[in-house]
Structures are given as structure tokens and as C-alpha cells.
Amino acid sequence: MRVSQILNPTLREVPAEAEVVSHQLLVRAGLIRKSAAGIYTYLPLGLRVLRKIEQIVREEMDAKGGQEVLLPIIQPAELWRESGRWDLYGQELMRLNDRHNREFCLGPTHEEIITDLIRGEIRSYKQLPLLLYQIQNKYRDERRPRFGLMRGREFIMKDLYSFDRDEAGLAESYKKMYDAYTRIFTRCGLTFRPVEADAGAIGGTGGTHEFMVLAESGEAAVVYCPDCDYAANVEKAECKPAPVAGDAPVGAYRGVDTPGTKTIEQVAEFLKVSKSDLVKSLLYQGDDKLFLILVRGDREINEIKVNNALGPFINLQLAGPEVVLEKLGCEPGYVGPIGAPKNLTVVADLEVPLMAKAVCGANAEDKHYVDAVPEKDFRIDQILDLRMVNAGEPCPQCGSPLKEARGIEVGQVFKLGTKYSKALNAVFLDENGAEHPCVMGCYGIGVSRTMAAAIEQNNDKDGIIWPIPIAPYHVIVVPVNMKDDQVRETGEALYQELLKLGVEAVLDDRDERPGVKFKDADLVGYPLRVTVGSKTLANGEVELRDRKTGEVQLVKVEELAGRIQGMIREALGVK
């Protein structure tokens, strides 16, 4: 392809609305254009990258026995009501009515549709296991679409669904997909880490892992152990209770005046104690239920853990000041567990019962209790892991200090179990004619998100640095002066030779200054650049530059195409 023929409108200025590097560079490099909030058009070079990621995904899904299907985007509401997710999904579900006022949604995911298909087609254990996948547009009515392709209203995903006879079969399917995902992201040239994760709205009773592309700009925090294979999203990471320090109080707890101290920091400073000596008490409302959640004062409540342990809830949130006043008779800053109403469930994090003595709110303005002993001076109805983990805490598997990194979720694998097959009656008959629900797994990859994540991980001040396997083209040939016959003809000849060898090459045949061509090449992120100039041609050589390392080599004209072909084959793993 010739640059003069490509629709590739590059920009020198950073778009005002682009907050993250990937969004900025996708627009500046002429790969996408915004159609509406969270909705984008893919231009030719952007679509080439997308198709390459899709092809890698297809090859690995097919290699594991997956069969490709195409499921409808528009899904009937009755299927979502059968599964119980029509209301659970909330406002992010894009809903619409047809002319007959029948309700539908634009699919954010396809568990209901695929399970409905299977219940109509699968009858016998002999038809299992089954792996079906699609690459399809998905829709989510994000309240605030942002970050370009990272969080849009329309996005492209691969989702595969496995159907097995039993949990052992599901475990085998899960491992197949886990291994396939590892190969996919390795082939894409990305640095990533699989981590234990939360199942979210998709649900299920089994395990789940997220595949995180590591990048400093990542919106998700992950913790991992450098000494064993433990890694988890902070939403899921297990916490080991910290060792207890201090002695139990000699006498009973007592009330103290704490005027104007509504925060943990203010109370700790006023009483000259550590934040870890305080009990943080927060009233949560899960749908129509109320819970008093207790954690140590230096810890943060993990609402994902709270929802999973006590719910799931359609809406879990901190109770408003008016509810706190009605139930506990005080402002939120003075809430405490001593004397909590019997109809209020008190749930404590694992560390709270281990505290020798504690400072807590007295449920009265400007008052706190000191020397309170958990489970002696106040009741605890449930004890659960409810807090966020921090870097430096002990690994739950081996005890080594955990480290933290930032990541971008690009894939997730779920063990759904029988959540959807029971709800939608997708059953099969075993060898004895007994009926059983299919045991399901769900495995998603954000294809368009992977494209953005690759840029977040691979960029510099000049633009994108595409890994060779997913680059729009492998090499760009840049004749620096199109008016010089030798330069122009050599560039053309090298371009044609590269094409004959199967190298994806593009020729910058524009009558532009060399600086403009070089800036565009770096911005778009072609992995290799061949510069054809009169000075090097005088010695029978051209310049070969590696975009990632910046390394420049002078290569004989007659050796160039073969050299590049070898580099590309090595990067693609072709023998």
C-alpha cells in the first residue's frame, strides 16, 4: 500500500477530550474517529490492527476446538428476565422497544442467548463437551464514556461459552481457555499477568481469572507475589489478618469527648493513637437490608467483597445521613458498634475481633468510646474478609510481601457452573436417562480494548510502538526525496521486493519533507522504517531503523529485503 492512497489523517495536536495516551494516539495517528460519546469509527490502519488481533484470537480458539457462531446483538427481554439479570444489570443495559412494544436490549454479553440456543439443540451427553465462540459488537450504556476504546458504549469482544457434563469437564475447558489466552496475549507481543478476580454481573459459583496487560496507566490495581504464582485483582485479593499488638484494657470501656472529629485521621490525632487502634464503622444499605460494616481504622472497605459475601445486591451503597440518623441517632462521623440495634446486622472484617482494645464511635455527636473490646463490649454477627489489600502485606499462599502493579483488563475466564443452565433449563440426559443441567464456562476477550491496551504499554513521546504481530504494516519504506530518480526508483524496487517476500510493507510516496514523513511513521508506529537517501545510496546502502529500540543499521540494498523478512518471521514465530 502507498501512503498517498491511505486514509490516514494524522494530527499534530493532542485532542482536548483525550485523557489517556491510547486515546490520544489512536486519534492523532489517524486510526479512529469519534462518531458519538463512546462510539468510534475505525479507519483503515486501525481496522488492520483490529483484524490482526481477531485473527490471532480465532486461530487459538479454533486450536482448542472452538466453533465460531454469530449471535444476535438485539436480545429479547424475556430471556434476561428468566436469568434474573434484567433488573440486576441496572442502567448500563441498553433497552429498547419495537413497534409492538416488545422489550429488547442491546447485548452487553450473550449468556442468555447462547443458553437459549443450547436448550433447544442439546439433548444427550454424547453432544458434550461443546465450545462455541463469536467475535461481536457489544453495548453498555456507560454513564460517562471515557478513555477512548478503553471504556466505550460500543466495543468489540470475543466470547466463548463451554458446555460440559460435570465440574471435571468444566475444569478441563477452563484450563484450555486459560492456556489459549496465555498464547493469545503472548502472540500479540504484550506483557501481561493472569490474576484472580471477581465475577461481577456475569456471576457464577466457580473461579475466575482476569488477564491484565501491565501498564502504569492501568485503571486496575493488582497485587502479586514475587516468590510464588499468587496474583489477584485488589478487588479479589485475600487478606491475612495482621499480628495483634498491645494489651487488653484493665477496666471497662469509657466515653470521651472528641469535639469536631468526624474522620479517622481527626480522631487518631485528637486522642494521640494510631489509626490501627480505631474501628471504622460504616452503615451500608444493600437493596432493602442494612449492615454495619466494621474494619480497622487504617483499612479500606472492599465493596466488591461486601457485595459477594452479603448479597448480591442490585444496589449496594453507603447509607445516607438521614438513614444513619434514623437508625443510630447520630451523624455518620460518630457511628459505632456499641449498643447497635438488634435488628441491624453487624459484620466485621477478620482483623476486628483480634484487636486487644479499640476506639470506636459512640453514636453521639462529639463522642467516642475508648478501650472497647470486640465481641465483649459489642456484638459481631458475622466475621468476613471485607477489606482492601495493600502492597507489602503477606501473600496468602506463601507469606512473602505482596507487590502492586497497574493493569488493564483485556480478558476474563469464568466458571459459571449451572447458574444460567438451571435458570433457562438447558439440560441433557446422561447414560441412564437422568436429566442434568449443562455445566457452563464463559471466556471473554476485549478485542478493541486489547488494541488500546497495547498502545498504553507500547508508546513514547513520538507515538505508538506496535508489537510486530499486530502492527498495521510491518515496515514503511521512506524515500526522502521523490524528485531524485535514484532515490524514488530504489524505494519502489525495495517496496516491491518486500511484498514478494510476504512482508507487509507500505511506501511513503508523498512529495513531503523527510521530517514530516519520519514524524508520521513514528506516530503511526510502524515497527521498522527503511530510509532511502542519496548519501547512503552512494555506498549502495539504506538505513534500517527499529522503532522500539531506536537502533539504526546501514544495510546493503541487495540484502535488505531478506534481512527484514527474517526479522518479521522471527517476531511472528514462523520457522
UniProtKB/Swiss-Prot annotation:
<dbReference type="InterPro" id="IPR023717">
    <property type="entry name" value="Pro-tRNA-Synthase_IIa_type1"/>
</dbReference>
<dbReference type="InterPro" id="IPR004500">
    <property type="entry name" value="Pro-tRNA-synth_IIa_bac-type"/>
</dbReference>
<dbReference type="GO" id="GO:0006433">
    <property type="term" value="P:prolyl-tRNA aminoacylation"/>
</dbReference>
<dbReference type="GO" id="GO:0140096">
    <property type="term" value="F:catalytic activity, acting on a protein"/>
</dbReference>
<protein>
    <recommendedName>
        <fullName>Proline--tRNA ligase</fullName>
        <ecNumber>6.1.1.15</ecNumber>
    </recommendedName>
</protein>
<dbReference type="InterPro" id="IPR006195">
    <property type="entry name" value="aa-tRNA-synth_II"/>
</dbReference>
<dbReference type="InterPro" id="IPR004154">
    <property type="entry name" value="Anticodon-bd"/>
</dbReference>
<dbReference type="GO" id="GO:0005829">
    <property type="term" value="C:cytosol"/>
</dbReference>
<dbReference type="InterPro" id="IPR045864">
    <property type="entry name" value="aa-tRNA-synth_II/BPL/LPL"/>
</dbReference>
<dbReference type="Pfam" id="PF03129">
    <property type="entry name" value="HGTP_anticodon"/>
</dbReference>
<dbReference type="InterPro" id="IPR002314">
    <property type="entry name" value="aa-tRNA-synt_IIb"/>
</dbReference>
<keyword id="KW-0436">Ligase</keyword>
<dbReference type="InterPro" id="IPR036754">
    <property type="entry name" value="YbaK/aa-tRNA-synt-asso_dom_sf"/>
</dbReference>
<keyword id="KW-0067">ATP-binding</keyword>
<comment type="subunit">
    <text>Homodimer.</text>
</comment>
<dbReference type="InterPro" id="IPR002316">
    <property type="entry name" value="Pro-tRNA-ligase_IIa"/>
</dbReference>
<keyword id="KW-0963">Cytoplasm</keyword>
<dbReference type="InterPro" id="IPR044140">
    <property type="entry name" value="ProRS_anticodon_short"/>
</dbReference>
<keyword id="KW-0547">Nucleotide-binding</keyword>
<comment type="function">
    <text>Catalyzes the attachment of proline to tRNA(Pro) in a two-step reaction: proline is first activated by ATP to form Pro-AMP and then transferred to the acceptor end of tRNA(Pro). As ProRS can inadvertently accommodate and process non-cognate amino acids such as alanine and cysteine, to avoid such errors it has two additional distinct editing activities against alanine. One activity is designated as 'pretransfer' editing and involves the tRNA(Pro)-independent hydrolysis of activated Ala-AMP.</text>
</comment>
<dbReference type="Pfam" id="PF00587">
    <property type="entry name" value="tRNA-synt_2b"/>
</dbReference>
<dbReference type="InterPro" id="IPR033730">
    <property type="entry name" value="ProRS_core_prok"/>
</dbReference>
<dbReference type="GO" id="GO:0004827">
    <property type="term" value="F:proline-tRNA ligase activity"/>
</dbReference>
<dbReference type="GO" id="GO:0002161">
    <property type="term" value="F:aminoacyl-tRNA deacylase activity"/>
</dbReference>
<comment type="similarity">
    <text>Belongs to the class-II aminoacyl-tRNA synthetase family. ProS type 1 subfamily.</text>
</comment>
<dbReference type="InterPro" id="IPR036621">
    <property type="entry name" value="Anticodon-bd_dom_sf"/>
</dbReference>
<dbReference type="Pfam" id="PF04073">
    <property type="entry name" value="tRNA_edit"/>
</dbReference>
<keyword id="KW-0030">Aminoacyl-tRNA synthetase</keyword>
<dbReference type="InterPro" id="IPR050062">
    <property type="entry name" value="Pro-tRNA_synthetase"/>
</dbReference>
<dbReference type="InterPro" id="IPR007214">
    <property type="entry name" value="YbaK/aa-tRNA-synth-assoc-dom"/>
</dbReference>
<dbReference type="GO" id="GO:0016740">
    <property type="term" value="F:transferase activity"/>
</dbReference>
<dbReference type="GO" id="GO:0005524">
    <property type="term" value="F:ATP binding"/>
</dbReference>
<keyword id="KW-0648">Protein biosynthesis</keyword>
